[in-house]
UniProtKB/Swiss-Prot annotation:
Organism annotation: Mycobacterium marinum (strain ATCC BAA-535 / M)
Name of the coding gene: fni
Binding site for Mg(2+): E166
Quaternary structure and partners: Homooctamer. Dimer of tetramers.
Positions bound to substrate: R11, K12, S100, Q101, R102, Q165
Protein name from the UniProt record: Isopentenyl-diphosphate delta-isomerase
Length: 348
């Protein structure tokens, strides 16, 4: 793939346009969360006002178990989007992932694009997670990645494994051979917690088994399952590349979010776990956390509000958090720990 910052910036803008204006959700695959019921307790002994949504992730306190998911960076509009997202995150006390910082690795023109990731001024206290692709995470790139993280004031690094997205992308990075070893080496060299994530096609049991077979065991500090059922980046890339859907089966391929949560949590009982991929409501979040996630991440539903204003983002998220609070209250959970203890019921 080209490393030209101008080409990367143009592609990022096309991603934004497609996500705003086209149907990019999975069609034949759901998150699987609808197959679970959060138990309703008519005799709850909780007070809605006393429900505690606080959480901790990578050692950072959060007022609610929510991260704003990775969206964009490098396009002209990205700066506005990211600053509005970060401002809302600061106001609500939640975390935020940046979009891919690949463009910042370019020594020449990437410096100009770096401003689109500069959010610390408006979000000094936010858990901020940087972002780079697994295909770009070579040992040689580690110093540049570390510099990019320092420049934006990140607390951690998300590494996105996106083989299907890259296969659909014009000129995409399609050589993932040796990427597990590179991930291990980079995680050892970086002085940051590393979060391994997908982009909407899911991390499940098979991927975790590969990670655990590496010398030294699990090389990352946490996992974001980024499951299927929400935005399909295979679909997005086809629409960007061809203007149409040429491979519909590939647009609907992935591990549903609920399935991914269960598989990863069973294999890794104590590893920090993010549930993302089609998380659209407070009820979705409650089910995901009851299944074993520590926090949830939300991305595309916040894109249009983020173009409008930080207040619009905050308003969307406040409704989401209000619903999550009611879910805990009406199932009898005072906090997230008791929510996990209550769990969910599979619908047969």
């Amino acid at each position: 793939m080209t490393n030209d910052p101008a080409e990367i910036s143009s592609r990022k803008r096309r991603h934004i346009d497609v996500c705003l204006n086209d149907e990019v959700n999975y069609v034949g695959v759901t998150t699987g969360l609808e197959r679970y019921r959060l138990p309703f307790n008519a005799l709850t002994q909780t007070s809605l006002a006393d429900i505690d949504l606080s959480a901790e992730f990578f050692g950072a306190p959060l007022r609610a178990p929510v991260l704003i998911g990775a969206m964009t960076g490098g396009a002209e509009l990205s700066a506005t989007i990211n600053r509005n997202l970060a401002t809302a995150a600061q106001r609500l006390g939640i975390g935020m992932m940046l979009g891919s910082q690949r463009i910042m690795l370019d020594d020449a023109r990437g410096q100009r694009a770096a401003s689109s990731f500069a959010v610390r001024e408006v979000a000094p206290d936010v858990l901020l997670i940087g972002n780079i692709g697994l295909a770009q995470l070579t040992k040689a790139a580690v110093p540049a990645v570390a510099a990019a993280l320092r420049r934006v004031g990140a607390n951690a690094l998300a590494v996105h494994a996106n083989s299907l997205q890259e296969a659909m992308q014009h000129g995409g990075d399609t050589d993932f051979s040796g990427s597990l070893g590179r991930l291990r080496d980079a995680a050892d060299l970086l002085d940051y917690p590393v979060l391994l994530k997908e982009v909407g096609h899911g991390i499940g049991a098979a991927a975790v088994a590969q990670l655990l077979r590496l010398p030294g065991g699990l090389p990352v500090s946490g996992i974001d399952v980024a499951g299927a059922g929400g935005t399909s980046w295979s679909r997005v890339e086809q629409l960007v590349r061809y203007g149409e859907l040429r491979y519909p089966e590939l647009a609907d391929w992935g591990i549903p979010t609920a399935e991914a949560i269960v598989e990863v949590r069973q294999a890794l009982p104590a590893v920090p776990l993010v549930a993302s991929g089609g998380i659209r409501t407070g009820m979705d979040a409650a089910k995901a956390i009851a299944l074993g996630a520590d926090v949830v991440a939300i991305a595309r539903p916040l894109l249009a509000p983020a173009i409008e204003s930080a207040t619009a983002v905050q308003g969307w998220l406040q409704l989401f958090l209000d619903e999550l609070r009611v879910c805990l209250h009406c199932c009898g959970a005072r906090d997230l720990t008791s929510l996990r203890d209550i769990g969910v019921t599979a619908i047969r």
